[in-house]
Amino acid sequence: MGSGKSTALEAFERLGALTLSADEVVHSLYEQQHVVDQLVDRWGAVVAPAGAVDRAALARLAFADEQQRAWLEGLIWPLVAAQVAAFREGSLVHTPRPPAAVVETPLLFEAGMEGIYDATIAVIANEELRRERAAGRGHEALDERNARQLSQQQKADRATYVVINDGTTAELEAELALILERLAE
């Protein structure tokens, strides 16, 4: 969180890549009735007052302990993986052919989804900058969320490419353009 994954995704789109945000996929899943029904069955109407998922309430309940989080991930991650697979298939027949199809997947390695991609990119940034960015977006609980994720170094060690995003958006986009050229080869 706060490393610049969403900014990187926007840059890839400007550079001509097809893009998909796994976060947006998750948000759309929370609007599907079969998902809402399962969430309400698990945690009660508090997670979906008036039929719409309250993501803050869901987060409080789902991340209260490991079993609750694992249950939610078991529900959501396979659905996300299916939509990512459909996106990938669509990208293969897209006209004109894009230089790459890029999926922003915040918990890529934690979800064990890295194997479905041809390459992975870890976008990392210094901790203080990440805190500033996260706070600017209303995400104050960076330490709590980070505790449930691999460290930036672990992600960098597992990624095909590593982008250090401590500079400007223009610098980030220039670095991503170089990666996009390599991916298009």
Task: Cite the ranges covered by each PLM segment.
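ATP-binding Walker
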Residues: S3
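Walker A/P-loop
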Residues: S6
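Post-Walker A helix-loop "phosphate-sensing" segment adjacent to the P-loop in P-loop NTPases
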Residues: E13-A22
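An amphipathic alpha-helix signature
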Residues: L15, V36-V40, A81, E127-A135
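Residue-level signal for inorganic ion chemistry
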Residues: D23, L72, V102, V163, ...
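ATP-dependent small-molecule kinase phosphotransfer cores
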Residues: E24-A100
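Small-molecule kinase domains that catalyze NTP-dependent phosphoryl transfer to phosphate-bearing small molecules
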Residues: Q83-V84, G115-I116, E127, R133-E185
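ATP-dependent NMP and nucleoside kinases share a basic, alpha-helical "lid"
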Residues: A85-A135
